[in-house]
C-alpha cells in the first residue's frame, strides 16, 4: 500500500509537491529539429514507487510539432505524462479564446466527482453543452446551466476520443488570424481546459 502526498484537498495533483512539473530537465538536441529533455524521479518521491526516468522529445515536422513521451521505471507505478500548454491562435495578448472555433472527435466525456476526479463513467455529449462533435465557439455554451460546467467554472474535462491508434482528436481555429491547429494522439482521451482558475494578470511569453 502506498500513500501519495496530497496537495489539492485530499487529492494528489500533478504528482504532488515534487512532480516533473517542478523539475529542471537536462536538455540536448538531435539534429536541427529535435529537442530532447530528460529528468529522473527517485523511488518514493511524494509516495510514488519506483525510480522513474522520463524523456520528452519535441520535434518539428513540416508545419507540425510532435511531442513524444517515454517513461521507464524499475517498479510498478502510476504515470500519466501529458502536456500543459495553452494556445491562443489569435496571437499574444489578443484577449479571450472564447471566440475560437473548436471541434472534438469525442462522443463522450468522463464524469467527475466533487473533487474533479473521474469516476470512470462515460457520459454522452449529444444534446448537452459539452458537445463539440460539430464545430462551435468555445464560449457558446461555457456559461450554460449544466452541472459539469458549473462545477469547474468552465471546461476542464477529459473527452473520450473515438477509435484507437494515431488519429485526429481536435481542430481549433483562431477567428482573427484564421490560424488552424489540428491535434493527433494515440491516447484514449484529451483534456479540454479553458484556464478557469488562472488569473488574468498571469505573465505569458511571446
Predicted features, each with a name:
Residues 1-206:
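An exposed, glycine/acidic-rich loop-and-rim segment of catalytic or binding clefts
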Amino acid at each position: 500500500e502506498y500513500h501519495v502526498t496530497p496537495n489539492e484537498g485530499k487529492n494528489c495533483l500533478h504528482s504532488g509537491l515534487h512532480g516533473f512539473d517542478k523539475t529542471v530537465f537536462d536538455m540536448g538536441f538531435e539534429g536541427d529539429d529535435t529537442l530532447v529533455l530528460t529528468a529522473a524521479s527517485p523511488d518514493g518521491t511524494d509516495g510514488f514507487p519506483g525510480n522513474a526516468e522520463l524523456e520528452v522529445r519535441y520535434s518539428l515536422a513540416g508545419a507540425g510539432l510532435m511531442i513524444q513521451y517515454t517513461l521507464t521505471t524499475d517498479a510498478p507505478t502510476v504515470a500519466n505524462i501529458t502536456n500543459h500548454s495553452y494556445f491562443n491562435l489569435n496571437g499574444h495578448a489578443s484577449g479571450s479564446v472564447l471566440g475560437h472555433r473548436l471541434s472534438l472527435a469525442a462522443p463522450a466525456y468522463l464524469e467527475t466527482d466533487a473533487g474533479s476526479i473521474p469516476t470512470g463513467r462515460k457520459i454522452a455529449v449529444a444534446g448537452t453543452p459539452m458537445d463539440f462533435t460539430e464545430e462551435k465557439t468555445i464560449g457558446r455554451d461555457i456559461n450554460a446551466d449544466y452541472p459539469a460546467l458549473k462545477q469547474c467554472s468552465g471546461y476542464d474535462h477529459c473527452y473520450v476520443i473515438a477509435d484507437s491508434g494515431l488519429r485526429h482528436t481536435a481542430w481549433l481555429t483562431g477567428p482573427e488570424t484564421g490560424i488552424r491547429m489540428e491535434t493527433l494522439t494515440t491516447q484514449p482521451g484529451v483534456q479540454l481546459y479553458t484556464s478557469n482558475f488562472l488569473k488574468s494578470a498571469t505573465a505569458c511569453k511571446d
